[in-house]
Amino acid sequence: VMFGPDGNNLLPAQVLYKKNILALRGSFRPVTKVNMDMFERAKELFFSEKKVDPENSQIIFEITLSNLRAEGEINERDFLDRAELLCSLGQNVMITNFQEYFKLVEYFSEFTKARMGLAMGVYNLIQIFDEKYYRHLSGGILEAFGKLFYRDLKVYMYPYRDEEKNEFITSENLKVHPRMKELYKFFKNNGKLIDISDFDQEIFHIFSRKVLKMISEGEEGWQEMLPEGVAETIVKKRLFGYSKSRIKT
């Protein structure tokens, strides 16, 4: 399912045909300033590529149902609320059933042979290099990586701040499983993994799950962690467990 900024259904075949595609996967529960910083920085890098014409490109915020299942029973209203907030920020939103990134890329490849980009945080990149996600494939992780990186694809990696070491984790100091080291180095050295370096260091304390907890428990302060206009919509429509009666005084 795909929605445009106006909230109306879109046909992926029409929207994505022969387009350059940049996709951001997340739970967006709710969308935070960190999500939008990743979006802005990845978009700058993607559009700076010689092969990418911004006029012939689509950016998609993707929510996968497999993540929703991990949170328990799928609540249709909940993920439609997430999509609505993203649409209100002027974005295209796609709800898919693809757990693995290579399946998402294969799907996009049905519509285009142009450049593709995936923007993601460190945690998601670590998952890509985790063999357990590919045990169902006869060729294992190598088959998945062939399907993922064989295409004209780049991954834009948003850093993570390690609070204990007080350092940012990037593709340079990221630790992957010893068996994956050479594979990781191969894709990094071939320019498939690009670090997002021009990021906002002031917002790294913001996590969607923390915001969600603050909303549901009636704590103050979560509003400042969200993009402009999002908090007002959450309050107005009482999304994510928000209730005026539960606000602490």
Protein language model features and the residues they cover:
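Nucleotidyltransferase catalytic core that binds NTPs
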Residues: 1-249
